[in-house]
């Protein structure tokens, strides 16, 4: 028998189904589960990392429990080693642990060789003295570990490209010559999230040491079709209820607000459960590199709060009717590392790549922004620069200090001014009349951007409801609005006072 076949044989011989309609029966792995195990353990190159991404309710937790028991007292047990499972919440971590305990208690042979410590969420495999711990991001037990096997459950819930808890687990494996990291999860909502980055890297790099099995429905899948369900639910009809799937699909069909949730959790698609202003496919349609040729250019300036992103977006219509977009961003240097973690965005990487500029100190120093803008606009025949008046006074002073004259025009952030600009930008994007070059910082802002409506149906971007920074999209919308002459009078829009938070 191969190594993978021994793992399968152990699970099907010693692991008992602990709950559900098949309770008490020997566990029988579905073909997709066997395929994954064989790919991981019989990989000629050796497997360092394995990813299995499937929709919810496809036997994920049972597979995790079976694999960890194979490493605890089965054919993969290694003398005096440690294995862990990790989840973001205590509840999720407890589910894996409790399922493994139930499997042990249902088999007298396993009961004899596994010591259970419920209070510490710990199992000891007595034959080889292997210790298993169920960890959660809410706990404080990740440091001092050295697991030869780590299984991460529902990593798709991590927002952004980094997570301290997961870092602590993965870096703790460095003491072993052949550690194994297994990730079993439904997909993340966005391309910029950690699991998406791991999956994309596995696909692009073709690293032979990474096994990656992803079951997902096509982007344009019809949510009512069985073939769409089957693409993401390989256990459909066995331990994934087809009747329940049909109910969920019917609900998504009659309730548009539920469709994104269904697509993410049940079709395993990268779809945010919050409806974005611009869909990923539309954004990518406009991803060609922008072209700087002589024309009239319009800018939008979003200064935001002094410790957030400051964004300048310059846009202009080319002879072919397409709008070319050039974004520029600034952020405080002193708090860069902290905000890289809190915002879950690779600001530090973008700074190194020249995509994000920094200013000294803990808040954005507008004098440095002004100096940069003076250099930037030398490449553009700038007609107007739309700005949000709430934070413009210091910016004006810094511009005056170096003798910089800018064609500044006030632009309200309420529904009155933002509404037409949002409509215009959306129309341009939907018709492929934008070239933004997939600038990573602007793309992050686009992914995060959501809109809200007033009673009349007017829309505006809303930072309070966004899933992350949207400053670049606000500036981009303002630049398009400035081009159409959609600017406020000196007094501003009443909506600004009612609907806009005073600080962000």
UniProtKB/Swiss-Prot annotation:
Top-rank taxon, per record: Viruses
Regulation: Inhibited by zinc.
Gene3D superfamilies, per database record: P-loop containing nucleotide triphosphate hydrolases
GO MF entry, a single one: endonuclease activity
Positions of region (Nuclease activity): 326-415
Motif extent (Walker A motif): 54-61
Cofactor: Mg(2+); Mn(2+)
Amino-acid positions noted as binding Mg(2+) in the UniProt annotation, renumbered to this chain: 471
Keywords: ATP-binding, Endonuclease, Hydrolase, Magnesium, Metal-binding, Nuclease, Nucleotide-binding, Viral genome packaging, Viral release from host cell
InterPro entries: P-loop_NTPase (IPR027417), TerL_ATPase (IPR046461), TerL_nuclease (IPR046462), Terminase_largesu-like (IPR005021)
Top EC class of this enzyme: hydrolase
Motif interval(s): Walker B motif: 149-154
Function: The terminase large subunit acts as an ATP driven molecular motor necessary for viral DNA translocation into empty capsids and as an endonuclease that cuts the viral genome from the concetamer to initiate and to end a packaging reaction. The terminase lies at a unique vertex of the procapsid and is composed of two subunits, a small terminase subunit involved in viral DNA recognition (packaging sequence), and a large terminase subunit possessing endonucleolytic and ATPase activities. Both terminase subunits heterooligomerize and are docked on the portal protein to form the packaging machine.
Sequence similarity: Belongs to the Hendrixvirinae large terminase family.
Assembly description: Homopentamer; forms a ring-like structure through which genomic DNA is translocated into the capsid. Interacts with the terminase small subunit; the active complex is composed of a pentamer ring of terminase large subunits and a nonamer ring of terminase small subunits. Interacts with the portal protein; this interaction allows the packaging of viral DNA.
Domain notes: The ATPase region is in the N-terminus, whereas the nuclease region is in the C-terminus.
Name by which UniProt lists this protein: Terminase, large subunit
UniProt source species: Enterobacteria phage HK97 (Bacteriophage HK97)
Organism placement in taxonomy: Viruses, Duplodnaviria, Heunggongvirae, Uroviricota, Caudoviricetes
């Amino acid at each position: 028998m191969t190594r993978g076949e021994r793992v399968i044989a152990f699970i099907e011989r010693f692991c008992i189904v602990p709950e559900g309609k098949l309770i008490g029966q020997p566990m029988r792995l579905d073909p997709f589960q066997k395929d994954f195990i064989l790919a991981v353990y019989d990989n000629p190159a050796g497997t360092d990392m394995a990813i299995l991404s499937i929709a919810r309710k496809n036997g994920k937790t049972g597979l995790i429990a079976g694999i960890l028991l194979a490493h605890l007292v089965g054919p993969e047990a290694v003398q005096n080693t440690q294995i862990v499972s990790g989840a973001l919440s205590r509840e999720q971590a407890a589910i894996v642990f409790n399922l493994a305990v139930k499997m042990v208690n249902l088999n007298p042979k396993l009961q004899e060789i596994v010591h259970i410590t419920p209070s510490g969420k710990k199992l000891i495999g007595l034959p080889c003295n292997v210790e298993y711990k169920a960890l959660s991001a809410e706990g404080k037990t990740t440091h001092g570990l050295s697991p030869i096997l780590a299984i991460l459950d529902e990593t798709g819930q991590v927002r952004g490209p980094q997570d301290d808890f997961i870092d602590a687990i993965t870096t703790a494996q460095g003491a072993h010559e052949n550690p194994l990291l297994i990730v079993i999860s439904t997909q993340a909502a966005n391309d910029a999230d950690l699991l998406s980055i791991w999956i994309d890297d596995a696909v692009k790099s073709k690293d032979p040491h990474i096994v990656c099995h992803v079951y997902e429905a096509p982007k344009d899948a019809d949510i009512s079709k069985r073939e769409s369900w089957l693409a993401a639910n390989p256990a459909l009809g066995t331990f994934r209820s087809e009747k329940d799937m049909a109910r969920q699909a019917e609900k998504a069909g009659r309730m548009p607000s539920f469709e994104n949730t269904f697509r993410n959790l049940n079709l395993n698609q990268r779809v945010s459960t919050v409806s974005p202003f611009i869909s990923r496919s539309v954004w990518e349609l406009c991803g060609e590199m922008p072209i700087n040729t002589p024309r009239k250019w319009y800018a939008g300036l979003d200064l935001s709060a002094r410790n957030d992103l400051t964004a300048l977006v310059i846009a202009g219509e080319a002879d072919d009717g397409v709008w070319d977009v050039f974004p520029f961003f600034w952020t405080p240097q002193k708090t860069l590392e902290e905000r890289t973690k809190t915002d879950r965005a690779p600001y530090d990487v973008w700074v190194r790549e020249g995509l994000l500029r920094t200013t000294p100190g803990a808040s954005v120093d507008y004098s440095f922004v002004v100096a940069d803008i003076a250099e930037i606009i030398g490449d553009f025949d700038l007609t107007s620069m739309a700005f949000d008046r709430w934070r413009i006074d210091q910016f004006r002073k810094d511009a005056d200090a170096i003798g910089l004259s800018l064609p500044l025009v006030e632009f309200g952030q309420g529904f009155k001014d933002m509404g037409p600009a949002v409509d215009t930008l959306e129309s341009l994007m939907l018709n492929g009349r934008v070239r933004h070059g997939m600038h990573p910082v602007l793309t992050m802002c686009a992914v995060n951007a959501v809109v809200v409506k007033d009673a009349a149906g007017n829309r505006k971007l809303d930072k309070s409801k966004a899933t992350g920074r949207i400053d670049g999209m606000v500036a981009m919308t303002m630049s398009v609005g400035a081009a159409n002459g959609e600017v406020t009078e000196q007094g501003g829009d009443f909506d600004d006072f009612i609907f806009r938070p005073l600080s962000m």
